[in-house]
Amino acid sequence: MPKIVVLVKFTPDLTGDRSFLADGTVDRLSVAGRLSELDEHAAEQALQVQESCAGSELVYLTMGPDGATDALRKALSLGGDAAVHVRDDALHGSDAFATSLVLAAAIGRLGFDLVLTGMASTDAGMGVVPALLAERLAVPQVTFAGRLTVSGGTVEILRDSDTVSETVAGGRRAGSSGLLTHRGRLR
């Protein structure tokens, strides 16, 4: 049974007013938030993969304050089987390195065959967490995935960037639990 993990992030609504805490971080409890739009693309792709792989399990994973549960609820409303929220006050204001460490540990505990993420979060837009996760999980990363299909243990991804379209295929290898890819791009 393939296990698909989709990372989702609760981000502040960019159209609303924001306030900041004394440490310079956004006060996420005082602003309206939402599921990052780019993570919705990953969720939609995961649902398509789940439909094509009988018996697969789709789990959403997030890290953040209490409000991050709203992102999980939104993702689950699209479909999927379960959601996991890593929440600890000690993680407040974590940078990309700490975030990738915590998420990699959570993914390791969950187990996975495929991890999907948005290409970046809509709040910071750095896009570095997926690459850090791939390194920590010792799996390849494929960026700008436009279409993803799974058949017989092989994952085929159409990469579509501004300059080139190409197909990348891979399967499970010794020492590798899966493939990390991220979906969507800024337009």
Q: Where do the PLM segments sit?
A:
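N-terminal glycine-rich FAD/FM-binding segment characteristic of electron-transfer flavoproteins
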Residues: 1-187
